Amino acid sequence: YLIMSVFLIGYCACDNDEENFDTATTGQVIKVPDDIKSFNSVTKEIVFEKNISIKQDVLGNEKVEFRIAGNGHFTVGSISSISSVIYNAPVLLGDYQRYYLYDGYPVVDVLQNEVRNQEERDENMQKIEKAWSNFLKVLNEAGKLK
């Protein structure tokens, strides 16, 4: 028991506040544009069709994959607005029955090192840049982009 206790204490002490979604599991697949009612490119609010339910996790262990009608896909972490962890990767934020697609969470303005966090977010968005452009294009063509 002593060895296990030391291991658990060490593991918890080494926890980093910045979350990496590479180890998360894909919990939901969203078909673009079919499963999306609208996406506001200014506020980043995304409204899903009625039958869509998104599982959220404050630790970022859930992922949502957006499959874009024959034009690729991208995956984001699905988190709740009550999360206190810094995410510098694209996220689907659930906030009281509303959802938002952000480049990270929380907004960089409230973080100590704004520049470093924004640079990391920009790098992660570049990784999905082609799929993100297709996402916006498909939604626009379907009349679902605001």
Residue spans for each PLM region:
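Short, Lys/Arg-enriched, disordered terminal segments
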Residues: 1, 15, 142-146
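Bacterial Sec-dependent N-terminal signal peptides
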Residues: 9-23
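A short, polar/charged loop-to-alpha-helix boundary motif
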Residues: 82-95
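Intrinsic disorder and flexible/low-complexity segments
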Residues: 21-67, 76-80
